[in-house]
Amino acid sequence: MNSEMLGLSYLQIALGKTDHLVAHINSNDKEPSWDGDVEVYRKAGHVHAKADLILKVPVQVKGHCKPNLKKKSIRYSIQYADLKNYLAIGGTIFFVIYINDSGDKAAIYYADLLPYDLKKHLKAYDGDPYKYKSIELKTFPKKKNDIADVFLNFTHHMNMQRASINSTPVTLESLCTSDPAQFSNIELTMGYSTTSRNYQ
């Protein structure tokens, strides 16, 4: 059984439910750290205008045969070299698909790896590209609007965090121990993007 190909198929079916996403994922993709990308559009529909494209989100997909498909979260080891590549382009959504022995059931897990989180994961990186970092992945939603929300929210934060790729992250601890005058002109904002709840 080809777990990689089956995993991609299950993910393609899940993404195909939505009205905001167009997936371009290939099991034979030759990119170094990715299997393709997912186009994210502002407006729902089966045909999308170029002007409505928000962003292409890079994705990496791993498929594995596992008997237990009921876990709410899993851990998966990712090479530091891949994490560095994800940071360099502004982020990646990483998928792991568990498939049962007969291949007729699957559980999809994901981690939205944005610059801020990637920098935290890379703190322990010592320069050895063959070392791995264990990352937690959560269950991927099943409803189409929730699936679209994962990507819409990711694109929002990916755009917001791009500027931080080459900068030192500001932590709550550093804010508490620094001179307040340094931050007199800093404005903190928060945001979240979702689909309209008017469609099912």
Predicted regions, residues:
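Catalytic centers of nucleases
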Residues: 2-77
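A generic structural signal for short, solvent-exposed coil/turn residues
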Residues: 28, 51-53, 87, 102, ...
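A general secondary-structure signal for short beta-strands and their flanking turns/coil
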Residues: 31-33, 54, 90, 183-185, ...
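Short, charged low-complexity intrinsically disordered segments located at boundaries
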Residues: 38-46, 125-126, 182-188
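Elongated alpha-helical scaffolds
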Residues: 54-120
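Short flexible/disordered coil segments
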Residues: 89-99, 124-130, 165-181
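Compact, glycine/acidic-enriched structural inserts
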Residues: 106-150
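Charge-rich interaction segments
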Residues: 136-200
